[in-house]
Amino acid sequence: MANASGFLGSSVPALRRATQPQHSISSSRGSSSDFVFKRVFCCSAVQGSDRQSLGDSRSPRLVSRGCKLIGSGSAIPSLQISNDDLAKIVDTNDEWISVRTGIRNRRVLTGKDSLTNLASEAARKALEMAQIDADDVDMVLMCTSTPEDLFGSAPQISKALGCKKNPLSYDITAACSGFVLGLVSAACHIRGGGFNNVLVIGADSLSRYVDWTDRGTCILFGDAAGAVVVQSCDAEEDGLFAFDLHSDGDGQRHLKAAIKEDEVDKALGSNGSIRDFPPRRSSYSCIQMNGKEVFRFACRCVPQSIESALGKAGLNGSNIDWLLLHQANQRIIDAVATRLEVPQERIISNLANYGNTSAASIPLALDEAVRSGNVKPGHVIATAGFGAGLTWGSAIIRWG
């Protein structure tokens, strides 16, 4: 199991007041934003899924610049599958599904539809909103557990976007937590690696790994893509206030799509020395999930993670404008909101329309909220992802 907790940008008002006497500034040749350092705090701990608390060990750390979210985009397949459609192939009905999950529809890739194309469309829309040219992108992070190439899809996305400067592009595999990990990774690359414009994409097509005769899982998942542009900025404008990330491999048995047991050519190696060589082509099993255990895990760990991140940022639930969770189950979303005392009108949810879209769910919901005018520049959002691995994590961010 592992845990990580993150930088606190000086944009947090309470932290800025607490650290103001300690500010130090140094300058050299080059742009001022590259050489201005603010003294901020970070804290970390290593704990398990059943034991978390706010870290009280704080040590000063220098952060040269911040990062902010300046554009979003999303894309969905054209085929919509309703609960009534599913009732034609498994023993279920609309009321049974909607009461237990909050889901009524989901979108599914079919035929020659490509997840890479879907992700590229979402990324293109995010660039348009941010008014950033593709040639100015210097990193592409593709958060997915369902790449269309074993070795990853991110380079193909940068190609599809027409990025001519060969930006660093790679995949992040962390299931439904992937987008939150992607945001934190982008921030770390910007703060410590000199990157300026990072595309963070969450995209998954879990419908390809669903047993469509299993009503316990086929009702849950849909396909989609969402993206944001994370841009470097002065430390004072930093839009990632704090984060809190975890994993616990002991819970992997509750939610997995494991590789099938290798099949081998038993006719080889009559002397027994190479009996199981060469193996045949491997493939993955359908998604297997213990729904009750996943529900317990999410309701226990997600509020703890958000509370921890808020504490590191010097904030509490009343300071956030929006709660944006991975869209897995409406009961989970409501339970976490109740624990954090966040009213329903401050919850972002589009689960009913799209189902669980894994790494795409957070950026998809965020993009819709931004384009509808609900999320405005300056709004503070507590976001959290959780899923297979088990992995979970939260980030306190500011839009714009």
Swiss-Prot record:
GO CC term, one of those recorded: chloroplast
Residues at the active site: 176, 326, 356
Q: Which Enzyme Commission numbers does its entry carry?
A: 2.3.1.180
Predominant location category: plastid
The pathway it acts in is:
Lipid metabolism; fatty acid biosynthesis
EC main class here is transferase
Looking up Gene3D superfamilies in the UniProt record yields: 3.40.47.10
Q: Which reaction does it catalyse?
A: malonyl-[ACP] + acetyl-CoA + H(+) = 3-oxobutanoyl-[ACP] + CO2 + CoA
Keywords (A to Z) from UniProt: Chloroplast, Fatty acid biosynthesis, Fatty acid metabolism, Lipid biosynthesis, Lipid metabolism, Plastid, Transferase, Transit peptide
Name residues in a coiled coil: none
Q: Which CDD domains match?
A: KAS_III (cd00830)
- Write down the superkingdom of origin: Eukaryota
Signal peptide coordinates: none
Compartment list: Plastid, Chloroplast
GO terms classed as biological process: fatty acid biosynthetic process
A GO molecular function term, named singly, is: 3-oxoacyl-[acyl-carrier-protein] synthase activity
Q: Which NCBIfam families match?
A: fabH, PRK09352.1
Q: Which HAMAP family does this UniProt record tie to the protein? A: FabH
**Function, please?**
Catalyzes the condensation reaction of fatty acid synthesis by the addition to an acyl acceptor of two carbons from malonyl-ACP. KAS III catalyzes the first condensation reaction which initiates fatty acid synthesis and may therefore play a role in governing the total rate of fatty acid production. Possesses both acetoacetyl-ACP synthase and acetyl transacylase activities.
Name the family the entry cites: Belongs to the thiolase-like superfamily. FabH family.
The name this protein goes by in its record: Beta-ketoacyl-[acyl-carrier-protein] synthase III A, chloroplastic
Species: Cuphea wrightii
GN (gene name): KAS3A
